[in-house]
């Protein structure tokens, strides 16, 4: 099986003189299941549709968008694996100089607001062909939303792009149903009821019964309290089994967002990952693609995440229901990968959004179908959560046993609070899959901040460190924790960052990289950033907005770097904590210092 066509010549080699669906994407074409557009294109091909891909077209004219001709059914547009504004700009709104999804890691292969620009060019080229938008950019901007880069509330992307339909969440079910219905002759503009899609109703059209109406665009754009109310309402409608359709008026137009698509069953997910991917970039891409190099030896075991972290949009995109592949499916993919010429024995990752959620499910099916919690872990783990861990541990053992596999890493991150209830997975992980360094993401240690983040607190982290230390010592392994920490999150003050810096110093930990909070579309944290409110409690939240405060917060986590000493002293003066300067900036603490960039040493917690 060959790559899907990117030119008319390649389509003709398949005997296709006309395509049914043409995808346009802001990423390079990598025929691998970790890349969304190729996955959906292969899925449609499997179901009998003729599909092509136009990767990273030059948007300065409409000609590159005509490379595969006029599709019979519709165009499908995605900005790529990332929101195009997130891909282009740093948290300080400075232009990035690289792009991991582009050959040669070059910046500039896609435009800002790629979904809008691509749709505009397609309408210029083929005005009468429907355009469907999807992917992370469209999904998380489907309602009126705060845009950090313009510092204002923008309309639904469906209206701004002037597209015909928006797919939100994982797209296999909605795009297949749409394609089948259009193929049978149903008028595109009459289709407004597919789960996992949003449409703009015709002027005067009545929304379906049972909808939840969000505050209109004009109100959320002008009133932060109405914005917070809209976020609170839509957050309750993420469970596909009990969600209502949502409507939001934009002037005289009405956005109708249908409930999320139902999760794929295990057999369906297995069939997706059994599709004939080449597991390589299209030959037209002559230079290495960093994102592919990073994931080419990885295996996705499941989708979804029920952690519900405030700054993460997975719940609003993939959903909180864990959709796990069968062990047989995962092993078959590892075997195919191990047979490839480039494979050298190392599987770089076996996981998903959160590695140790594989096989975890709700033990109360009836209650789970009516549940409106965004997080199954915060403020405390749900009593119905069937966490097990044995299935995940057994899968790791089986992957290690595949012929040709010498090393297996788990690099997609873990929830250490969940792993307290997964002894089998914990033992398997520490014994065979750490490789000396284990990445975890406590993000902060001050309770007020971790509560707003919906993360476990310091006590949970301390328990995990002690457990990790004991198990590593028992195994005779020198292994370290790499904690990922965040500055500038809503609710976090300079005083909170001083406490976090002191914790790091006393623990003998030094970090070299800090994630500065970026308000990305669709998250609870972004709602708090824009409104200065907790939308669920209604309480005011401190928001670090100015460049100075953000710079000083970040500097406190890098207290050990000589280049940050002046910023650290400025931060201590700004919050009246000069008294801790000697402890923070003086000699080593924590009994022997810290290993730069490596995290905690077992035995020195």
UniProtKB/Swiss-Prot annotation:
Note describing how the cofactor binds: Binds 1 [4Fe-4S] cluster. The cluster is coordinated with 3 cysteines and an exchangeable S-adenosyl-L-methionine.
Family annotation (Pfam families): DUF3362 (PF11842), Radical_SAM (PF04055), Radical_SAM_N (PF08497)
PANTHER family recorded: UPF0313 PROTEIN YGIQ
GO molecular function, one term: 4 iron, 4 sulfur cluster binding
UniProt superkingdom: Bacteria
Annotated SUPFAM superfamilies: Radical SAM enzymes
InterPro entries from the UniProt entry: Elp3/MiaA/NifB-like_rSAM, Methylthiotransferase_CS, rSAM, rSAM_horseshoe, UPF0313, UPF0313_C, UPF0313_N
Cofactor(s) listed: [4Fe-4S] cluster
Protein name: UPF0313 protein GSU2873
UniProt source species: Geobacter sulfurreducens (strain ATCC 51573 / DSM 12127 / PCA)
Biological classification of the source: Bacteria, Pseudomonadati, Thermodesulfobacteriota, Desulfuromonadia, Geobacterales
Radical SAM core domain sequence ranges: 291-561
């Amino acid at each position: 099986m060959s790559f899907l066509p990117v030119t008319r010549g390649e389509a003709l080699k398949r005997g296709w003189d006309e395509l049914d669906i043409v995808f346009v994407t802001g990423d390079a074409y990598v025929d691998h299941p970790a890349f969304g557009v190729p996955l959906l294109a292969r899925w449609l091909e499997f179901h009998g549709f003729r599909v092509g891909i136009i990767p990273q077209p030059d948007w300065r004219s409409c000609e590159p968008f005509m490379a595969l001709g006029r599709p019979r059914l519709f165009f499908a547009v995605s900005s790529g694996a990332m929101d195009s504004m997130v891909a282009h700009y740093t948290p300080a709104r400075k232009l990035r100089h690289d792009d991991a999804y582009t050959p040669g890691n070059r910046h500039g292969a896609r435009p800002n607001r790629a979904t809008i620009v691509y749709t505009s060019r397609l309408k210029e080229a083929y005005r009468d062909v429907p355009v469907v938008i999807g992917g992370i950019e469209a999904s998380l901007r489907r309602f009126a939303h705060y845009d950090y880069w313009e510092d204002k509330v923008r309309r639904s992307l469906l209206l701004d792009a002037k597209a015909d339909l928006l797919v939100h969440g994982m797209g296999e079910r909605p795009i297949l149903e749409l394609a089948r219905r259009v193929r049978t002759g149903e008028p595109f503009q009459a289709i407004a009821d597919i789960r996992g899609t949003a449409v703009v109703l015709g002027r005067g059209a009545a929304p379906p019964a049972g909808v939840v109406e969000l505050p209109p665009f004009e109100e959320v754009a002008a009133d932060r309290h109405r914005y917070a109310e809209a976020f609170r309402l839509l957050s309750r409608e993420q469970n596909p089994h009990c969600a209502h359709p949502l409507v939001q008026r934009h002037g005289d137009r009405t956005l109708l967002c249908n409930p999320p698509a139902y999760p794929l069953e295990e057999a369906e997910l297995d069939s997706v990952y059994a599709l004939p991917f080449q597991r390589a970039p299209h030959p037209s891409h002559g230079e290495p693609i960093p994102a592919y190099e990073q994931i080419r030896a990885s295996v996705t075991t499941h989708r979804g995440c029920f952690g519900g972290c405030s700054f993460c949009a997975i719940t609003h995109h993939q959903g909180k229901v864990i959709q796990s592949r069968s062990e047989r499916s995962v092993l078959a993919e590892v075997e195919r990968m191990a047979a490839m010429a480039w494979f050298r024995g190392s599987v770089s990752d076996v996981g998903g959004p959160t590695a140790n959620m594989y096989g975890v499910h709700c033990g109360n099916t009836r209650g789970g179908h009516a549940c409106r919690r965004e997080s199954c872990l915060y403020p405390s783990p749900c009593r119905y959560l069937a966490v097990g861990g044995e299935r995940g541990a057994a899968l790791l053992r089986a992957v290690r046993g595949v012929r040709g596999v010498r090393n297996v890493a788990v690099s997609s991150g873990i929830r250490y609070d969940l792993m307290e209830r997964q002894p089998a997975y914990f033992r398997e992980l520490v014994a065979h899959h750490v490789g000396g360094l284990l990445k975890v993401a406590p993000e902060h240690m001050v309770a007020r901040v971790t509560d707003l983040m919906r993360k476990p607190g310091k006590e949970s982290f301390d328990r995990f460190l002690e457990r990790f230390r004991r198990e590593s010592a028992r195994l005779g392994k020198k292994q370290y924790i790499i904690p990922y920490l965040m500055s500038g999150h809503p609710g976090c003050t300079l005083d909170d960052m001083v406490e976090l810096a002191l914790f790091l110093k006393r623990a003998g930990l030094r970090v070299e990289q800090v994630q500065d909070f970026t308000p990305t579309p669709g998250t609870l944290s972004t709602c708090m950033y824009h409104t200065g409110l907790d939308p669920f409690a209604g309480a005011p939240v401190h928001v670090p907005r100015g460049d100075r405060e953000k710079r000083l917060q970040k500097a406190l986590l890098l207290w050990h770097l000589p280049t940050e000493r002046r910023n650290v002293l400025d931060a201590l003066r700004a919050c009246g904590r000069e008294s801790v300067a000697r402890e923070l900036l003086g000699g080593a603490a924590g009994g022997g210092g810290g290993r730069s960039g490596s995290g905690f040493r077992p035995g020195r917690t």
